Amino acid sequence: METKRVLLLLSFAIVLSISLGDEEFANQSHDWKYFVFSQWWPQSQCYYKENADSLADQSFRIVNDYRFRNDCVPTYVENWTIHGLWPTLNGTPHPGWCNDSWKFNESKIEDLKSKMMRQWITLPDSSESELLWKHEWEKHGTCAASLPAVSSEHAYFLQALTLNRQTNLLKMLADKGLSPSDDNMYKVEEFEDAIMKEYGVKGRVICVKERGDDQYTYIGGIRICFNKTFSPIDCLVTEPERCREGEALKYPVIIRA
């Protein structure tokens, strides 16, 4: 009898230990310190598509396929658009998928959709924008929701739209001498310096490369980091992505059909 009792207690202790361990792991995996706010230059998105089956994959490639037109930007899109607002820990966009049961509900953002179709779209095919919103909410928004300011689907998307409007990258860069051009090329560090001059922090430049030798490199995106009160802070990862310091970038003019 005593042996059976000991075995039962031991089994309970093991189960409790595993349970607490899982809970501790879950808490750790959901921890984050700041936001990475990623924005795209829409014209550069016309030149490439995803090289994977998921919107989560960041491996893009230029396509020279007649099915993907370089005049893909809708007439109502004129500024930099949102890629995502990502809770981040130690320089990587983690955690992710923090609540599998909290699915994207488009009706929750019905009043924001007209703004989102101008500020948060997928290119070259804007008809897939709702898939991007779904992905961004379920992967990143459910983790951001631990912060009261963005604790609902509506609040999360509204905050990202607000940051996009406040940063106004098209005007900010133009004020620093960086405007879309068919002729001018800009160095990677000119974009980095513009972020530093405007916000006093280090951001990150994301580039897009054409396939083949001696092809152009485009400015594809800019990432600016914010703390949990949405004040700009230095990003932990600041080296350019898919390009290098000193490299010349095209900042293409939006092509209209």
Tell me what each language-model feature is.
Residues 3-21:
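Cleavable N-terminal signal peptides of Sec/SRP-targeted secreted and luminal proteins
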Residues 23-126:
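Betabetaalpha-Me/HNH-type nuclease active-site subdomain
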Residues 13-15, 40, 65-66, 92, ...:
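Processing junctions and N-termini across compartments
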Residues 1-3, 257:
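A positional/structural detector of protein chain ends, strongest at the extreme C-terminus
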Residues 11, 71, 75-76, 224-225:
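Terminal and linker regions of secretory-pathway proteins
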Residues 6-8, 34, 79, 223:
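Beta-sheet entry/capping signal
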Residues 116-257:
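C-terminal, well-folded lobe of enzymatic/effector domains
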